């Protein structure tokens, strides 16, 4: 591309100004002196190549290129441009420099330490290099995700992180204009902060979930304010303080005019008042709907019709607000792959103090994703949201499994009338074919394959329907959701008034999914090496020697890939080649045994202990005989949010001695 002379001279002038501003010449002189002093022998001459290497090593060239990109970007932005898409990234532990768009407004949020985390009052100072429990702070604001560096758990955790949050309007015409104070005052999205604790074994715990109202900074002098945030516990401890964070908020570029604190407070009070009124009206309507539902049949009182559910902070919210069409971008390609992703997120019931029934806790999506595990309702809500994003008519079903255990799963309704159940905890799919209990069976009816027994209601982001059929048994239910004699609907307008995006300020916004940060090859290799060591030590304790056969280990890879492919697509492929290769690798008169197993965590020691509980696997690991050769292969398959499926296969071959 050639430039006219006037443009070329203008560009040279811009570059020269930028280099002078950065004092590049001074920095080059310093590095030149340092290189001659420290790296060159007395009789050696410094070449241009050596100097460029030294500049590149110290990051000078990268800094210059970034700054020059910044300048050219600003030149290009003089032309009209379409609104920029929101950025989503997961902040890594290493700090990275960010190019700031001078046409946008930013909120710089700094976390300047914590205090009063009394649960860790007696926590000793970790020794250098010692593995210890850590705190990680996760943030979400308007489609942007951030994660702090992990800090050791302590009474006063050493949080020192800064997060640059872009503040903008998404409506047409406003996307390219810098937001002023009045515009920002109308942006009611809070900053969702989630605190996660990770123990020395890699197990995560949700410590706190907090919605930060940031707009007080708009009424502060110079657009800068400091505040203390008291974090409360979750679930049964939602009224107990877990600690305090010191936070500083700063607008960038600085505001030309700040609003009065009275205007800010009035706006916030008005929003709270509107939200409270909408929620009150919905509650009145829900009570009326429930009375009508009970009048159909008094036995409906015992059905699992869930209109409201408590989140991690103990706040009652309509169940429809936990679901929303969610697009995974390029991270997941198919609905079945989405089901596999949800399946490999860990399953853990909400912790409860003491005995009794199940503790209810439907987590907000950010809390579920950051903790990387949750209850069946969390899995079902996420899977339903993803399936809605793929354009399917999906609903969360609330009912029971065997022995009357409450459960949630997902249902999709096809255009051809097919009803499919999706089990979010396993990724399995079941076609539902209702049986008519009034007709005498010509032949014995086959037992349904799905584990569900009863169903009380179904819902998504727009609809809520209570089951009003004579029986709530799943096998006899007809899923014609338009038939009001079988399914009593709630008003879609009433649901929209409290569950539509932006309907109320108390509605947590949905975060985007983040790509995995796990290197599958490196992690697979690490776990495999750890398992080899554990097997060798275990056999040594039994007085057995261990001989590994690398080729046999390698031959196990296709089987593991085939197992994961089958979980993702429900199609079995590649097994014939694996069996043929094993037959060739095992000589006549020898026996081959293999044991595949699947985990959703990366703790090798924990996986090994689980494997030893299987008699068949123990038989392989503790194999005795002539010419015993052992093999182990690990294959980690990564999914968004650093979730992963870990396949392990232990195998042995030995000469059969009668």
Curated annotation (Swiss-Prot):
Positions bearing Phosphoserine: 74, 82
Organism: Pongo abelii (Sumatran orangutan)
InterPro entries for this protein: CEP76, CEP76-C2, CEP76_C, CEP76_N, CEPT76/DRC7_peptidase-like_dom, Papain-like_cys_pep_sf
Family: Belongs to the CEP76 family.
Functional note: Centrosomal protein involved in regulation of centriole duplication. Required to limit centriole duplication to once per cell cycle by preventing centriole reduplication.
The encoding gene: CEP76
Record's protein name: Centrosomal protein of 76 kDa
Localization annotation: Cytoplasm, Cytoskeleton, Microtubule organizing center, Centrosome; Cytoplasm, Cytoskeleton, Microtubule organizing center, Centrosome, Centriole
Domain of life the protein comes from: Eukaryota
């Amino acid at each position: 591309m050639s430039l006219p002379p006037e443009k070329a001279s203008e560009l040279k002038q811009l570059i020269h100004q930028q280099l002078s501003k950065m004092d590049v010449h001074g920095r080059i002189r310093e590095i030149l002196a340092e290189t001659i002093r420290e790296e060159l022998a007395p009789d050696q001459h410094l070449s241009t190549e050596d100097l460029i290497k030294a500049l590149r090593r110290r990051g000078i060239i990268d800094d210059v290129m970034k700054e020059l990109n910044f300048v050219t970007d600003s030149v290009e932005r003089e032309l009209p441009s379409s609104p920029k898409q929101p950025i989503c990234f997961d902040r890594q532990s290493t700090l990275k420099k960010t190019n700031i768009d001078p046409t946008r407004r930013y909120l710089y949020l700094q976390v300047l330490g914590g205090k009063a985390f009394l649960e860790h009052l007696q926590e000793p100072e970790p020794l250098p290099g010692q593995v210890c429990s850590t705190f990680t702070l996760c943030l979400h604001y308007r489609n942007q995700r951030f994660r702090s560096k992990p800090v050791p758990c302590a009474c006063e955790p050493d949080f020192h992180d800064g997060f640059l949050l872009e503040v903008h309007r998404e409506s047409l015409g406003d996307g390219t204009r810098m937001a002023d104070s009045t515009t920002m005052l109308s942006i009611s999205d809070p900053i969702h902060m989630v605190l996660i604790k990770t123990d020395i074994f890699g197990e995560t715990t949700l410590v706190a979930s907090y919605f930060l109202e940031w707009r007080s900074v708009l009424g502060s002098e110079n657009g800068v304010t400091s505040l203390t945030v008291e974090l409360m516990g979750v679930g049964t401890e939602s009224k107990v303080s877990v600690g305090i964070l010191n936070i500083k908020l700063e607008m960038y570029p600085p505001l030309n005019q700040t609003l009065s604190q009275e205007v800010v407070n009035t706006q916030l009070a008005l929003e709270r008042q509107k939200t409270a009124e909408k929620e009150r009206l919905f509650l009145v309507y829900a009570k009326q709907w429930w009375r009508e539902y009970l009048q159909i049949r008094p036995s409906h009182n015992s059905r699992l019709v869930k209109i409201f559910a408590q989140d991690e902070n103990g706040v009652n919210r309509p169940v429809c607000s936990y679901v929303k069409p969610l697009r995974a971008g390029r991270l997941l390609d198919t609905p079945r792959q989405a089901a596999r992703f949800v399946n490999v997120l860990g399953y853990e019931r909400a912790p409860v103090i003491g005995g009794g029934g199940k503790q209810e806790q439907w987590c907000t999506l950010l809390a579920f994703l950051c903790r990387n595990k949750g209850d069946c309702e969390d899995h079902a809500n996420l899977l339903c949201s993803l399936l809605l994003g793929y354009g399917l008519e999906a609903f969360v079903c609330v009912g029971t499994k065997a022995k009357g255990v409450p459960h949630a799963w997902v249902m999709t309704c096809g255009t051809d009338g097919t009803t499919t159940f999706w089990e979010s905890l396993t990724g399995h799919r079941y076609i539902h074919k209702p049986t008519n209990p009034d007709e005498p069976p010509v032949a014995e009816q086959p037992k349904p394959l799905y584990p569900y027994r009863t169903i009380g209601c179904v819902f998504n982001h727009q609809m809520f329907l209570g089951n009003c059929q004579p029986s709530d048994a799943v096998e006899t239910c007809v899923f014609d959701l338009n038939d009001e004699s079988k399914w009593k609907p709630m008003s879609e307008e009433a649901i929209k008034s409290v569950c539509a995006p932006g309907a109320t300020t108390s509605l947590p916004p949905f975060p985007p999914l983040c790509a995995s940060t796990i290197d599958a090859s490196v992690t697979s290799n690490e776990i495999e090496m750890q398992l080899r060591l554990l097997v060798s030590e275990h056999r040594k304790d039994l007085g057995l020697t261990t001989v590994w056969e690398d080729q046999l280990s390698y031959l196990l890879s296709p089987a593991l890939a085939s197992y994961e492919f089958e979980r993702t697509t429900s199609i079995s492929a590649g097994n014939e080649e694996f069996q043929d290769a094993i037959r060739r690798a095992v000589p006549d008169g020898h026996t081959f045994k293999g044991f595949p197993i699947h985990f959703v965590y990366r703790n090798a020691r924990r996986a090994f202990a689980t494997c030893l509980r299987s008699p068949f696997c123990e038989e392989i690991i503790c194999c005795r005989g002539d010419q015993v050769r052992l093999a182990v292969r690990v294959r980690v398959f990564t999914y968004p949010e650093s979730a992963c499926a870990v396949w392990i296969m232990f195998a042995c071959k030995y000469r059969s001695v009668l």
